[in-house]
Regions:
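Extended lipid/amphipathic-ligand handling interfaces
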Residues: 92-96, 133-137, 178
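N-terminal post-signal-peptidase region of extra-cytosolic proteins
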Residues: 47-64, 68-73, 89, 133
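Short, small-residue-rich packing micro-motifs
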Residues: 67-129, 147-156
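Short N-terminal segments immediately surrounding and downstream of signal-peptide cleavage
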Residues: 26-45
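C-terminal interaction modules
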Residues: 2-31, 51-57, 88, 142-145, ...
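Generic short beta-strand segments
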Residues: 40-43, 72-75, 134-135, 154
Length: 281
């Protein structure tokens, strides 16, 4: 059995949900198209053997077309099955076979897959995520990744490594190095993420707000029972470095809410950890 480095932190980040079931037919995926539904600053579409062009709302995005975002830029793509993908700053993304093969080459994305859709799979280097009927966030770079679930459940795994797979539930986050064995997920504060993430504050409602709010309320109830405890452990912006901060600074983060972030992009300006009460000493 592989040992896992278990942390009982709760960080305000969101992840995508996975539902178990057989894959839909190839024909079902091939009918799915994507369209640009929101553009913030510098976003380019790069087709196969074609020059880059500036993306505009209502542009059609075909499979194999790379979507690139610049510094402090974001974009939203909506597929014909109502699946929504939002990319943060400095991201590179493309897809094939509809939502069956979403490829995040670099950067961060939010993915919302409605229960009526066939589901989706995100590939990012040496890791992958299977999602059905949920809302998730994945940040990927060559040296680290960070995955959060906002509602539902998703599966994070490493293709080609039998058994290296974990279920990540709403309010949980997993992070690590892409080529290392997966670690057990930790808790994060959904409510704080929803208040501070540009994936949420810079866009129109996703359609899964009631589901995310329900999961946040569950966390609040667990806090009132002391099963979850707020900590002063914070991840600022992108990355996976956990910082120990003064409690007053955590309060200031809440007050800033969706204010300008020191690190442009779609991850929250800061994520605050929660501790599982039953594990607290």
């Amino acid at each position: 059995m592989n040992s896992r480095n278990v942390c009982s932190l709760v960080v305000s980040i969101n992840l995508v949900v996975f539902a178990v079931g057989g894959p839909p037919s190839v024909s079902a995926w091939q009918k799915i198209e994507a369209r640009v539904t929101r553009v913030i600053q510098d976003v380019q579409l790069v087709g196969t053997n074609a020059a880059a062009r500036i993306a505009a709302v209502n542009d059609s995005v075909s499979e194999g077309t790379k979507v690139r975002t610049g510094a402090d830029s974001r974009v939203e793509l909506t597929f014909s099955d109502k699946t929504v993908t939002r990319l943060g700053a400095n991201a590179v993304f493309d897809f094939r076979d509809g939502t069956r093969n979403l490829n995040l080459e670099d950067g961060a994305l939010l993915l919302r897959v409605p229960k009526s859709a066939n589901g989706a799979r995100i590939s990012a280097g040496a890791i992958a995520v299977a999602v059905t009927g949920t809302t998730v966030v994945l940040e990927y770079h060559a040296t680290y990744y960070k995955f959060l679930v906002l509602d539902g459940t998703a599966r994070l795994y490493r293709p080609g490594h039998l058994g290296d797979s974990i279920l990540v539930k709403a309010g949980q986050m997993a992070f690590g190095q892409p080529k290392a064995a997966l670690s057990d997920p930790v808790d994060f504060d959904i409510g704080r993420f929803l208040k501070t993430s540009r994936f949420i504050t810079d866009f129109s409602p996703l359609g899964s707000e009631s589901l995310m709010a329900s999961e946040s309320h569950k966390q609040q109830r667990e806090k009132s029972k002391k099963n979850l405890i707020d900590t002063n452990l914070v991840i600022f912006g992108g990355g996976t470095v956990v910082s120990l901060v003064d409690p007053a600074q955590v309060t200031a983060i809440d007050q800033e809410k969706a204010g300008p972030s020191a690190i442009p992009g779609s991850v929250p300006p800061a994520t605050t950890a929660l501790n599982s009460g039953e594990k607290a000493k």
